[in-house]
Amino acid sequence: MTICVRVRVSGRVQGVGYRYYTTTHAKALGVKGWIRNLPGGGVEAVLEGERKSVGELLGLMKSGPSGAMVSGMEIAEVECKGHDDFKIIY
C-alpha cells in the first residue's frame, strides 16, 4: 500500500549532509518525493512509497548522518501526488 507523509525535522540537520543522506537512502528504498532546507534551520520532506519503505526511511531520518542531531520530527499523512523520483529542492 502506497502512503505519503510530510516530515518536518528539527535539530542540527543543515550543513551536515542530511538532505544528501536522505536522498541516497530514499532512492535505495524506492521512496519518491523531495527534501528541502527550511528557514530557521530545519528540513522538510515529502515521502511517497510503500508503508514499509517509508517507515524504514523515517527511522534512518531520525538517526541522520554523522554530525546531525535530530531533536524532533513532525509527521503528517498527506495526499499522494505521484512523484516519479526523489530530489533535493534548492
From Swiss-Prot:
Pfam families given in the database record: Acylphosphatase (PF00708)
Residue ranges constituting the Acylphosphatase-like domain according to the UniProt record: 4-90
Enzyme active site: 19, 37
Catalyzed reactions per annotation: an acyl phosphate + H2O = a carboxylate + phosphate + H(+)
Gene3D superfamilies: 3.30.70.100
Leading EC class: hydrolase
Keyword Flavoprotein assigned: no
E.C. designation(s): 3.6.1.7
GO molecular function annotations of the record: acylphosphatase activity
Keywords: Hydrolase
Hydrolase listed as a keyword: yes
Matching PROSITE patterns: ACYLPHOSPHATASE_3
Family that this chain belongs to: Belongs to the acylphosphatase family.
Record protein name field: Acylphosphatase
